A protein has these predicted regions:
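Short, conserved alpha-helical segments within structured domains
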Residues: 177-178, 245-249
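Short, hydrophobic secondary-structure boundary micro-motifs
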Residues: 121-122, 241, 288
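Nucleotide-sugar donor-binding/catalytic module of glycosyltransferases
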Residues: 1-222, 226
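Short, charged, amphipathic alpha-helical segments
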Residues: 239-247, 269
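Catalytic core of nucleotide-sugar-dependent glycosyltransferases
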Residues: 190, 197-206, 211-237, 252, ...
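Membrane-interface aromatic/basic loop that binds lipid-linked glycans or pyrophosphate carriers
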Residues: 22, 32, 259-312
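Solvent-exposed aromatic/hydrophobic patches embedded in short alpha-helical segments
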Residues: 156-157, 249-250, 254
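Inter-helical turn/loop segments and adjacent helix faces that build the functional surface
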Residues: 169-171, 235-239
């Protein structure tokens, strides 16, 4: 939690509505400078099973999650951002489903909350409440798949996935760490399920959210996807997954280029320069196939960027 004083009470109240003797709450205060620390301390004093982890300096969401992982002692781990909340009984429902299915992890629906509007968003899984192979949730390249649902808090993960020191969030990434993590999860785990559960509420449009920033932190999707490409190139099933990785990287570049005028001028210039270099780093044959099969608007934009041509 970092400077979420406006939302901390409702977030922590939702945890109280999920309290159980077998559930521990690890509250990570990432060096907040507003009212967040006081709210967290007051709540933790009243709630058995709650532990406060305090960072002496702001380290970012990746390290905050890693600190929670390292301190966790339960059989399952899940995450909640400081401005979001749970419906009553959500965590117990997740645990019941995992106990019944016996899979490594499960993803869930979530409720997108924009002001007073509520919309249920579902992961693009082929079936619900059945155990599947996570690798089957990555491809094909031209379809929306489970790796396109990067909300790590919309899920629950068995402890053993983290026990070897793996499945930590990349702390060098200030944004897009969730996208890389979800890909690695699907490459590493052996079984998963998509649950018909929608008890986590995602507060959209918060001014302080990392999704709203206009500075260079937005550009961390580039090193995130560079790392992903390296993972896929080392994987035994490179040919199966490389087209999806390249296409998703291209889609992210096109998305950010499309809104570059909203960014700080120096960030927009750096975006165009680094995105061009990223396109030249991609496997050439796979990139050409991607540009051929993408929609014409994005394909033209990416081709112009790669070749150094200006828009007509």
């Amino acid at each position: 939690m970092h400077n979420v004083g406006a939302f901390a009470e409702s977030t922590l109240r939702s945890l109280a509505n999920n309290a159980h003797p077998d559930i521990e709450f690890l509250l990570v205060d990432d060096c907040s400078t507003d009212s967040t620390p006081g709210v967290v301390d007051r709540w933790a004093e009243r709630r058995p099973g709650a532990k406060v982890i305090r960072h002496e300096k702001n380290m970012g969401i990746a390290q905050a999650r890693n600190s929670g992982i390292d301190a966790a002692s339960g059989d399952y781990i899940t995450f909640l951002d400081g401005d979001d909340w749970y419906g009553p009984g959500h965590l117990a429902e997740l645990v019941r489903a995992m106990d019944e299915l016996g899979c490594d992890f499960a993803r869930t629906d979530h409720v997108q909350a924009t002001g007073t509007e509520r919309v249920i968003r579902r992961p693009p899984a082929p079936v619900r409440n059945l155990v599947m192979d996570p690798r089957d949730g990555i491809a094909p390249a031209d379809s929306e798949t489970m790796v396109d649902y990067p909300f790590v808090w919309a899920g629950i993960y068995r402890r053993h996935l983290f026990d070897d020191g793996g499945m930590r969030f990349a702390t060098e990434l200030r944004t897009a760490e969730d996208r890389l993590w979800i890909w690695r999860l699907h490459l590493k785990a052996r079984t998963y399920a998509s649950l018909g559960v929608h008890g986590v509420f995602y507060r959209r449009g918060v001014a302080t959210s990392l999704t709203q920033i206009k500075d260079a932190r937005q550009l961390d999707f580039i090193p995130a996807y560079d790392a992903l490409l390296q993972d896929v190139l080392k994987d035994p099933e490179t040919e199966r997954f490389l087209p999806k990785a390249v296409r998703t990287y291209c889609a992210m570049i096109a998305f950010h280029i499309g809104k570059a005028n909203e960014y700080e001028p120096s960030t927009a210039q750096r975006l165009r320069r680094e995105a061009k270099a990223a396109l030249h780093r991609m496997p050439e044959r796979t990139l050409e196939e991607t540009l051929t099969t993408m929609d014409s608007t994005r394909s033209r934009s990416l081709s112009r960027l790669r070749d150094g041509r200006k828009a007509a």
